[in-house]
């Protein structure tokens, strides 16, 4: 029987086949006529891609049926290798939450009066409750940079 194969260019070629022929055989005949290797050929009939091991009868391809030939697409981009790191990831520092931590800034004296142990920053932009750091020779505000230096008694 005779079937037609329509190529991408619109050219139609005729092939002499039997209904018992496999799709592999049909692709080999197309290679003889067109020079396209069978591994690059995809044959479509009635919207379905024809698989190599099956016969024309499996797909109900009869005389004077038209198959559509499309070329197989090349694969996608080259697969990238997963990056391997030599050093382990640095563990992020976790701040410890200490309950009642504010108690270290205050002291209750013998009379029951609450005293501040640290000096509060007088600058308006820092706001109330901003304590200055106690250094051996000065008080320092980390927020605004205000510094008070202790007077040294008995200048040497």
Curated annotation (Swiss-Prot):
<dbReference type="InterPro" id="IPR019954">
    <property type="entry name" value="Ubiquitin_CS"/>
</dbReference>
<keyword id="KW-1017">Isopeptide bond</keyword>
<dbReference type="InterPro" id="IPR019956">
    <property type="entry name" value="Ubiquitin_dom"/>
</dbReference>
<dbReference type="InterPro" id="IPR000626">
    <property type="entry name" value="Ubiquitin-like_dom"/>
</dbReference>
<comment type="similarity">
    <text>In the N-terminal section; belongs to the ubiquitin family.</text>
</comment>
<dbReference type="InterPro" id="IPR038582">
    <property type="entry name" value="Ribosomal_eS31_euk-type_sf"/>
</dbReference>
<dbReference type="GO" id="GO:0003729">
    <property type="term" value="F:mRNA binding"/>
</dbReference>
<feature type="domain" description="Ubiquitin-like">
    <location>
        <begin position="1"/>
        <end position="76"/>
    </location>
</feature>
<dbReference type="GO" id="GO:0005737">
    <property type="term" value="C:cytoplasm"/>
</dbReference>
<dbReference type="GO" id="GO:0031625">
    <property type="term" value="F:ubiquitin protein ligase binding"/>
</dbReference>
<feature type="cross-link" description="Glycyl lysine isopeptide (Gly-Lys) (interchain with K-? in acceptor proteins)">
    <location>
        <position position="76"/>
    </location>
</feature>
<protein>
    <recommendedName>
        <fullName>Ubiquitin-ribosomal protein eS31 fusion protein</fullName>
    </recommendedName>
</protein>
<keyword id="KW-0479">Metal-binding</keyword>
<dbReference type="GO" id="GO:0019941">
    <property type="term" value="P:modification-dependent protein catabolic process"/>
</dbReference>
<comment type="similarity">
    <text>In the C-terminal section; belongs to the eukaryotic ribosomal protein eS31 family.</text>
</comment>
<dbReference type="GO" id="GO:0003735">
    <property type="term" value="F:structural constituent of ribosome"/>
</dbReference>
<dbReference type="Pfam" id="PF01599">
    <property type="entry name" value="Ribosomal_S27"/>
</dbReference>
<keyword id="KW-0963">Cytoplasm</keyword>
<dbReference type="GO" id="GO:0005840">
    <property type="term" value="C:ribosome"/>
</dbReference>
<feature type="zinc finger region" description="C4-type">
    <location>
        <begin position="121"/>
        <end position="144"/>
    </location>
</feature>
<feature type="cross-link" description="Glycyl lysine isopeptide (Lys-Gly) (interchain with G-Cter in ubiquitin)">
    <location>
        <position position="48"/>
    </location>
</feature>
<keyword id="KW-0687">Ribonucleoprotein</keyword>
<keyword id="KW-0862">Zinc</keyword>
<keyword id="KW-0832">Ubl conjugation</keyword>
<dbReference type="InterPro" id="IPR002906">
    <property type="entry name" value="Ribosomal_eS31"/>
</dbReference>
<dbReference type="GO" id="GO:0006412">
    <property type="term" value="P:translation"/>
</dbReference>
<dbReference type="InterPro" id="IPR011332">
    <property type="entry name" value="Ribosomal_zn-bd"/>
</dbReference>
<dbReference type="GO" id="GO:0005634">
    <property type="term" value="C:nucleus"/>
</dbReference>
<dbReference type="GO" id="GO:1990904">
    <property type="term" value="C:ribonucleoprotein complex"/>
</dbReference>
<dbReference type="GO" id="GO:0031386">
    <property type="term" value="F:protein tag activity"/>
</dbReference>
<keyword id="KW-0539">Nucleus</keyword>
<dbReference type="InterPro" id="IPR050158">
    <property type="entry name" value="Ubiquitin_ubiquitin-like"/>
</dbReference>
<dbReference type="InterPro" id="IPR029071">
    <property type="entry name" value="Ubiquitin-like_domsf"/>
</dbReference>
<dbReference type="GO" id="GO:0016567">
    <property type="term" value="P:protein ubiquitination"/>
</dbReference>
<dbReference type="Pfam" id="PF00240">
    <property type="entry name" value="ubiquitin"/>
</dbReference>
<dbReference type="GO" id="GO:0008270">
    <property type="term" value="F:zinc ion binding"/>
</dbReference>
<keyword id="KW-0863">Zinc-finger</keyword>
<keyword id="KW-0689">Ribosomal protein</keyword>
């Amino acid at each position: 029987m005779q079937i037609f194969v329509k190529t991408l260019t619109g050219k139609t070629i005729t092939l002499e086949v039997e209904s018992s022929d496999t799709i592999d055989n049909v692709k080999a005949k197309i290679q003889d006529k067109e020079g396209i290797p069978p591994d690059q050929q995809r044959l479509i009939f009635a919207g379905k891609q024809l698989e190599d091991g099956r016969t024309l009868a499996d797909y109900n391809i009869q005389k004077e049926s038209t198959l559509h030939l499309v070329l197989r697409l090349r694969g996608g981009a080259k697969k990238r290798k997963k990056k391997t790191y030599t050093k382990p990831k640095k563990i992020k520092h976790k701040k410890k939450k200490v309950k009642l931590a504010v108690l270290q800034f205050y002291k209750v004296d013998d009379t029951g009066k609450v005293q501040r142990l640290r000096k509060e920053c007088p600058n308006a932009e820092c706001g109330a409750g901003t304590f200055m750091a106690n250094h051996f020779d000065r008080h320092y505000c980390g927020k605004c940079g205000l510094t008070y230096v202790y007077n040294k008694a008995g200048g040497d």
